[in-house]
UniProtKB/Swiss-Prot annotation:
Subunit structure: Monomer.
Organism superkingdom: Bacteria
EC code(s) of this entry: 6.1.1.19
PROSITE patterns noted in UniProt: AA_TRNA_LIGASE_I
Sequence motif: 'HIGH' region, positions: 132-142
Name of the protein in question: Arginine--tRNA ligase
UniProt keyword annotation of Oxidoreductase present: no
């Protein structure tokens, strides 16, 4: 529990006692007291609507109730500096500044752990994201999903959730058959032999490279073997080649997974048919027109869904159900799937399947990643300058940099369309959001280095009561919000809230820096306090950037 949370608990307890004294209720009769941080700092550090909540019980106007509570609140409490009534009965609190300066040694001590909390209470979440077919390069939608999924996992972990990250490898189905046939054609081509390229084949440069690799590895060994033997071998090589490429690209993007789950393993370990039988036992399977159906309309889907076609082949839905059953059987409390915009219509049937399996539909959450459009100098960019083809994740990173790519993709809610301004992302000005935040970190690092050169080290023992300017208090207030912002971003599955916070923190630091001299050799005690203060800002900026997979540079 952080200092701010401790103060909130103390304040709530004090409000409860004031209500008991002023209104004459027993403690157990006092409704839950909610504290909000006013948007306008002129309205205090916290506000509560408890007087409105008590109006019916006390049979009085909320403002009248508030007027009876306030005198009790002012009694014997060092935390509160001032209390006022606003509007119809809101009670606004201004806290004593000592509660802010107490933050500094705490942040210095917690360092990389600052921002952590037990908010999630160890609840087990699995986040499955990216899960692109292993048949080509990652595109911009995958990149946005990767940035958001990885950031969300980092945020939820810091907020006290037990989080596992998973990539579902779609290594079964027609797309893999087409990959193998494409690799086979390029293999023959690399050997100088004629071969008909499959109509639905993959024509990317990576498949040409794969064909050359196969030719170099096997020579003409598989020219005269049976198709079955050749394609069986090439399937293994092609999947290893493509998944290896995906892993490398994601690793470069600072995205890691705890589990790479193979769709093929569902068949090899006989996980598909038991899922079907469970649905049948629960009474939601029926046969019609030679096909096997799942009655998802029982769970608000707009129509029932085919699981096995009349020719005996499975639809994509059946192994997807088996996969989600497997996840739940692994003991996760909640599954978060991060899907592309084209999967929006898939949500009702998947939630219906979860319920038909006997689980709560609330155990599946789906975050939709909306489309990304690239712009440069105000003009939409559709093709890569380098390849003349669609822009890939790799292309974008090479063009604007890894940090800018990660940060920009986290800036907007995932369910909104995104116009990615490459010109802005490459800009070295304060108009560039990631540059603005990173520059604040680098500037602090520079000041700390200068202080060290003059023999001044950051110490927890500095006299923090010397921090008395408005800009210092404003910076401390923003610093104190970090753990709550992390918990809120985790709860709302909203990495963009961390981006917003970092911008606010950088702004608060710049305001402080522009109005306060940090290194003042004629006033060493104040200098020591301010060095400690900016060190806490540096720590918090770094921790926030780390959540987003963005570096915190010492120099720029």
């Amino acid at each position: 529990m952080n200092v701010m949370q401790e103060n909130q608990i103390k304040l709530i307890a004090h409000i409860k006692q004031a209500v008991v004294q002023a209104v004459g209720l027993e403690e157990a009769e006092v409704p839950e007291i909610l504290l909000e941080v006013p948007k306008d700092k002129k309205h205090g550090d916290y506000s509560t609507n408890i007087a409105m909540q008590l109006a019916r019980v006390a049979k009085k106007a909320p403002r009248q109730i508030a007027e009876s509570i306030v005198p009790e609140l002012k009694k014997d409490n060092k935390l509160i500096k001032e209390v006022e009534i606003a509007g119809p009965g809101f009670i606004n609190f201004y806290l004593d500044n000592a509660y802010l300066t107490d933050l500094v040694p705490v942040i210095l001590t917690e360092d990389k752990q600052y921002g952590e909390s037990d908010f999630g209470k160890g609840e087990k979440f699995q986040i499955e994201f990216v899960s692109a077919n292993p048949t080509g390069d990652l595109h911009l939608g995958h990149a946005r999903g990767a940035a958001i999924g990885d950031s969300l996992a980092n945020i939820m972990k810091m907020a006290g959730f037990d989080v596992s990250r998973e990539y579902y490898i779609n290594d079964a189905g027609n797309q893999i058959n087409n990959l193998v046939l494409s690799a086979e054609a390029r293999y023959f081509e690399a050997l100088g032999l004629d071969s008909e390229f499959p109509e639905d084949g993959y024509r990317g440069a990576d498949i040409i490279s794969l064909g050359k690799d196969l030719a170099a590895k096997y020579g003409d060994k598989y020219v005269h073997t049976s198709e079955e033997e050749r394609r069986s071998v090439f399937r293994v090589d092609a999947l290893a080649f493509e998944t290896g490429k995906l892993r490398a690209d994601l690793e470069e993007f600072r995205v890691s997974f705890d589990e790479w789950f193979s769709e093929t393993s569902l068949y090899e370990e006989n996980k598909v048919l038991p899922a079907l039988e469970r649905l049948r036992e629960n009474g939601y399977i029926y046969e019609q027109d030679g096909a096997t159906w799942l009655r998802t309309t029982d769970f608000e889907d707009d129509k029932d869904r085919v699981l096995i076609k009349s020719d005996g082949s499975y639809t994509y839905f059946l192994p997807d159900i088996a996969y989600h059953l497997n996840k739940l059987e692994r003991g996760f409390d909640v599954l978060i799937d991060i899907w592309g915009a084209d999967h929006h219509g898939y949500i009702p049937r998947m939630r219906a399947a979860i319920e038909a399996l006997g689980y709560s539909p609330n155990q599946l959450e789906v975050e939709i990643i909306q489309l990304v459009h690239l712009f440069e100098d105000g003009v939409q960019v559709k093709m890569s300058k380098r390849t003349g083809k669609s822009v890939t994740m790799r292309d974008l990173i090479e063009e604007v940099g890894l940090d800018a790519t990660r940060y920009f993709f986290a800036m907007r809610s995932s369910d909104t369309h995104m116009n990615f301004d490459m010109s802005l992302a490459k800009s070295t000005s304060n108009d560039n959001p990631v540059y603005y935040v990173q520059y604040a970190h680098a500037r602090i690092s520079s000041i700390l280095r200068s202080g060290k050169e003059q023999g001044l080290e950051v110490t927890k023992d500095a006299d923090m009561s010397l921090l008395q300017t408005e800009a210092e208090y404003d910076l401390l207030k923003v610093l104190g919000e970090f753990a709550d912002v992390v918990a809120e971003a985790a709860t709302k599955r909203a990495p963009h809230r961390i981006v917003r916070y970092l911008n606010d923190l950088a702004s608060a630091f710049h305001r402080f820096y522009n109005s306060n001299k940090v290194l003042d050799m004629d006033n060493l005690e104040v200098t020591k306090a301010r060095l400690a203060l900016i060190k806490t800002a540096q720590i918090t900026l770094r921790n926030g950037l780390t959540l987003l997979g963005v570096s915190a540079p010492e120099k720029m």
